[in-house]
Amino acid sequence: MGEVKAGGPSTRVMEGSEHGFATTRVDALLNWAKKYSLFQYPFVTACCGMEYMAMASPRFDMARFGAEVPRFSPRQADLLWVVGTISQRQAPALKRIYEQMADPKWVLAFGTCASCGGFYDNYTTVAGIDKVIPCDVYVPGCPPRPEAVLDGLMLLQDKIARGDRTPAIVKPREDPAQTTEHLVTLQRKERSLP
Protein backbone atom coordinates (compact mmCIF):
# COMPACT_ATOMS: atom_id res chain seq x y z
CA MET A 1 0.00 0.00 0.00
CA GLY A 2 1.34 3.44 -0.85
CA GLU A 3 0.40 7.10 -0.90
CA VAL A 4 0.03 8.70 -4.35
CA LYS A 5 -0.49 12.38 -5.10
CA ALA A 6 -0.72 12.94 -8.84
CA GLY A 7 -2.15 16.43 -9.23
CA GLY A 8 -5.46 15.41 -7.74
CA PRO A 9 -6.79 14.41 -4.38
CA SER A 10 -4.73 12.17 -2.16
CA THR A 11 -5.32 8.57 -3.14
CA ARG A 12 -4.23 5.24 -1.75
CA VAL A 13 -3.03 2.52 -4.06
CA MET A 14 -4.21 -0.85 -2.83
CA GLU A 15 -2.11 -3.86 -3.70
CA GLY A 16 -3.31 -7.38 -3.59
CA SER A 17 -5.24 -7.60 -6.78
CA GLU A 18 -3.65 -8.34 -10.10
CA HIS A 19 -3.80 -4.75 -11.40
CA GLY A 20 -4.18 -2.81 -8.14
CA PHE A 21 -6.72 -0.08 -7.63
CA ALA A 22 -6.87 3.34 -6.04
CA THR A 23 -9.23 4.65 -3.39
CA THR A 24 -9.91 8.20 -2.26
CA ARG A 25 -12.37 10.15 -0.18
CA VAL A 26 -15.45 11.13 -2.17
CA ASP A 27 -15.41 14.74 -0.93
CA ALA A 28 -11.75 15.14 -1.95
CA LEU A 29 -12.54 13.82 -5.42
CA LEU A 30 -15.57 16.12 -5.76
CA ASN A 31 -13.60 19.18 -4.60
CA TRP A 32 -10.83 18.33 -7.07
CA ALA A 33 -13.40 18.17 -9.89
CA LYS A 34 -15.18 21.38 -8.77
CA LYS A 35 -12.02 23.45 -8.80
CA TYR A 36 -11.54 22.82 -12.53
CA SER A 37 -15.17 23.31 -13.56
CA LEU A 38 -16.08 26.79 -12.39
CA PHE A 39 -19.07 28.32 -14.14
CA GLN A 40 -18.66 32.05 -13.77
CA TYR A 41 -21.24 34.82 -13.73
CA PRO A 42 -19.64 38.25 -14.32
CA PHE A 43 -21.36 41.16 -12.52
CA VAL A 44 -19.52 44.02 -14.24
CA THR A 45 -20.38 47.56 -13.17
CA ALA A 46 -17.39 49.86 -13.69
CA CYS A 47 -13.97 50.42 -15.25
CA CYS A 48 -12.51 47.13 -14.00
CA GLY A 49 -14.64 45.56 -16.72
CA MET A 50 -11.92 46.48 -19.22
CA GLU A 51 -9.37 44.42 -17.28
CA TYR A 52 -11.91 41.61 -16.98
CA MET A 53 -12.17 41.54 -20.78
CA ALA A 54 -8.37 41.58 -21.09
CA MET A 55 -8.11 38.73 -18.61
CA ALA A 56 -10.71 36.70 -20.50
CA SER A 57 -8.74 37.10 -23.75
CA PRO A 58 -6.58 34.33 -25.21
CA ARG A 59 -3.38 36.01 -23.98
CA PHE A 60 -4.10 35.13 -20.35
CA ASP A 61 -6.07 31.95 -21.18
CA MET A 62 -8.55 31.37 -18.37
CA ALA A 63 -9.46 28.09 -20.09
CA ARG A 64 -6.48 26.37 -18.46
CA PHE A 65 -8.13 27.02 -15.08
CA GLY A 66 -11.54 25.70 -16.13
CA ALA A 67 -13.29 29.09 -15.87
CA GLU A 68 -13.37 30.29 -19.46
CA VAL A 69 -17.06 30.23 -20.34
CA PRO A 70 -19.24 32.84 -18.64
CA ARG A 71 -22.81 31.94 -17.80
CA PHE A 72 -25.36 34.71 -18.07
CA SER A 73 -27.90 33.02 -15.85
CA PRO A 74 -27.07 32.89 -12.14
CA ARG A 75 -28.86 29.55 -11.85
CA GLN A 76 -26.18 27.98 -14.06
CA ALA A 77 -23.21 29.61 -12.29
CA ASP A 78 -21.26 28.80 -9.16
CA LEU A 79 -18.61 31.57 -9.29
CA LEU A 80 -19.71 35.21 -9.06
CA TRP A 81 -17.17 37.77 -10.30
CA VAL A 82 -18.07 41.16 -8.80
CA VAL A 83 -16.19 43.58 -11.03
CA GLY A 84 -16.23 47.26 -10.06
CA THR A 85 -18.14 49.63 -7.82
CA ILE A 86 -21.42 48.55 -6.22
CA SER A 87 -23.90 51.33 -5.52
CA GLN A 88 -26.63 51.18 -2.89
CA ARG A 89 -29.18 50.73 -5.71
CA GLN A 90 -27.28 47.78 -7.18
CA ALA A 91 -26.83 46.00 -3.84
CA PRO A 92 -30.32 44.36 -3.77
CA ALA A 93 -29.83 43.08 -7.34
CA LEU A 94 -26.41 41.67 -6.42
CA LYS A 95 -27.87 39.93 -3.38
CA ARG A 96 -30.70 38.46 -5.49
CA ILE A 97 -28.22 37.16 -8.07
CA TYR A 98 -26.14 35.57 -5.30
CA GLU A 99 -29.21 33.88 -3.83
CA GLN A 100 -30.17 32.45 -7.24
CA MET A 101 -26.80 30.80 -7.79
CA ALA A 102 -26.34 27.06 -7.45
CA ASP A 103 -24.72 25.67 -4.30
CA PRO A 104 -21.84 25.47 -3.59
CA LYS A 105 -21.12 29.02 -4.72
CA TRP A 106 -18.08 31.23 -4.52
CA VAL A 107 -17.54 34.99 -4.88
CA LEU A 108 -14.45 36.79 -6.18
CA ALA A 109 -14.19 40.58 -5.61
CA PHE A 110 -12.37 42.05 -8.61
CA GLY A 111 -10.69 45.37 -7.87
CA THR A 112 -10.46 47.81 -5.00
CA CYS A 113 -13.99 49.18 -5.48
CA ALA A 114 -15.57 45.75 -5.11
CA SER A 115 -13.24 44.86 -2.24
CA CYS A 116 -13.56 47.95 -0.06
CA GLY A 117 -15.44 50.68 -1.97
CA GLY A 118 -12.35 52.18 -3.59
CA PHE A 119 -11.93 55.93 -3.58
CA TYR A 120 -15.71 56.42 -3.62
CA ASP A 121 -16.38 57.24 0.03
CA ASN A 122 -19.94 58.53 -0.06
CA TYR A 123 -23.47 57.53 0.81
CA THR A 124 -24.28 56.01 -2.61
CA THR A 125 -21.46 53.46 -2.67
CA VAL A 126 -21.26 50.16 -0.82
CA ALA A 127 -17.94 49.99 1.03
CA GLY A 128 -17.09 46.46 -0.10
CA ILE A 129 -19.32 43.65 -1.30
CA ASP A 130 -18.92 41.79 1.99
CA LYS A 131 -21.51 44.23 3.36
CA VAL A 132 -24.04 42.61 0.97
CA ILE A 133 -22.88 39.04 0.25
CA PRO A 134 -20.08 36.81 1.60
CA CYS A 135 -16.84 37.00 -0.38
CA ASP A 136 -14.26 34.23 -0.76
CA VAL A 137 -11.35 35.99 -2.51
CA TYR A 138 -10.44 39.68 -2.71
CA VAL A 139 -8.24 40.84 -5.60
CA PRO A 140 -7.07 44.41 -4.86
CA GLY A 141 -5.94 46.87 -7.49
CA CYS A 142 -7.34 49.79 -9.45
CA PRO A 143 -7.70 48.00 -11.79
CA PRO A 144 -6.00 44.74 -10.83
CA ARG A 145 -3.60 43.33 -13.36
CA PRO A 146 -4.80 40.18 -15.15
CA GLU A 147 -1.97 38.23 -13.50
CA ALA A 148 -3.28 39.22 -10.06
CA VAL A 149 -6.77 38.10 -11.03
CA LEU A 150 -5.42 34.75 -12.21
CA ASP A 151 -3.58 34.48 -8.87
CA GLY A 152 -6.95 35.07 -7.20
CA LEU A 153 -8.54 32.37 -9.33
CA MET A 154 -5.78 29.91 -8.40
CA LEU A 155 -6.17 30.87 -4.73
CA LEU A 156 -9.89 30.16 -5.02
CA GLN A 157 -9.16 26.79 -6.63
CA ASP A 158 -6.86 25.89 -3.74
CA LYS A 159 -9.58 26.90 -1.27
CA ILE A 160 -12.13 24.76 -3.12
CA ALA A 161 -9.78 21.75 -3.10
CA ARG A 162 -9.25 22.13 0.67
CA GLY A 163 -12.94 22.83 1.37
CA ASP A 164 -11.94 26.15 2.96
CA ARG A 165 -14.59 28.90 3.14
CA THR A 166 -12.61 31.63 4.93
CA PRO A 167 -11.99 34.89 3.00
CA ALA A 168 -8.57 35.37 1.38
CA ILE A 169 -6.73 38.33 -0.13
CA VAL A 170 -4.41 38.07 -3.13
CA LYS A 171 -0.98 39.42 -2.26
CA PRO A 172 0.67 41.41 -5.08
CA ARG A 173 3.57 39.80 -6.87
CA GLU A 174 6.95 41.38 -6.49
CA ASP A 175 7.90 43.10 -9.74
CA PRO A 176 11.55 42.34 -10.54
CA ALA A 177 11.88 45.76 -12.20
CA GLN A 178 11.20 47.45 -8.84
CA THR A 179 13.46 45.47 -6.52
CA THR A 180 16.59 47.09 -5.14
CA GLU A 181 18.80 44.23 -6.32
CA HIS A 182 17.68 44.81 -9.90
CA LEU A 183 18.39 48.57 -9.57
CA VAL A 184 21.87 47.91 -8.18
CA THR A 185 22.61 45.60 -11.12
CA LEU A 186 21.47 48.30 -13.56
CA GLN A 187 23.66 50.91 -11.86
CA ARG A 188 26.71 48.62 -12.07
CA LYS A 189 26.09 48.06 -15.78
CA GLU A 190 25.78 51.82 -16.37
CA ARG A 191 29.09 52.47 -14.57
CA SER A 192 30.92 49.87 -16.63
CA LEU A 193 29.85 51.42 -19.95
CA PRO A 194 32.50 53.64 -21.65
UniProtKB/Swiss-Prot annotation:
Is Secreted a UniProt keyword of this protein? no
Which family is annotated? Belongs to the complex I 20 kDa subunit family.
**Where does it reside?**
Cell inner membrane
Q: What is its main location?
A: membrane
- Gene3D superfamilies in alphabetical order: 3.40.50.12280
Function of the protein: NDH-1 shuttles electrons from NADH, via FMN and iron-sulfur (Fe-S) centers, to quinones in the respiratory chain. The immediate electron acceptor for the enzyme in this species is believed to be ubiquinone. Couples the redox reaction to proton translocation (for every two electrons transferred, four hydrogen ions are translocated across the cytoplasmic membrane), and thus conserves the redox energy in a proton gradient.
> What is the reaction catalyzed?
a quinone + NADH + 5 H(+)(in) = a quinol + NAD(+) + 4 H(+)(out)
Q: What InterPro entries does the database record attribute to this sequence? A: NADH_UbQ_OxRdtase-like_20kDa, NADH_UQ_OxRdtase_20Kd_su
Q: What is the lineage of its organism?
A: Bacteria, Pseudomonadati, Myxococcota, Polyangia, Polyangiales
Q: Which UniProt keywords apply?
A: 4Fe-4S, Cell inner membrane, Cell membrane, Iron, Iron-sulfur, Membrane, Metal-binding, NAD, Quinone, Translocase, Transport, Ubiquinone
Organism encoding this protein: Sorangium cellulosum (strain So ce56)
Q: Which cofactor does it need?
A: [4Fe-4S] cluster
Instruction: List positions binding [4Fe-4S] cluster.
Output: C47, C48, C113, C142
What protein name does the entry list? NADH-quinone oxidoreductase subunit B 1
Q: How is the cofactor bound?
A: Binds 1 [4Fe-4S] cluster.
Subunit composition? Answer: NDH-1 is composed of 14 different subunits. Subunits NuoB, C, D, E, F, and G constitute the peripheral sector of the complex.
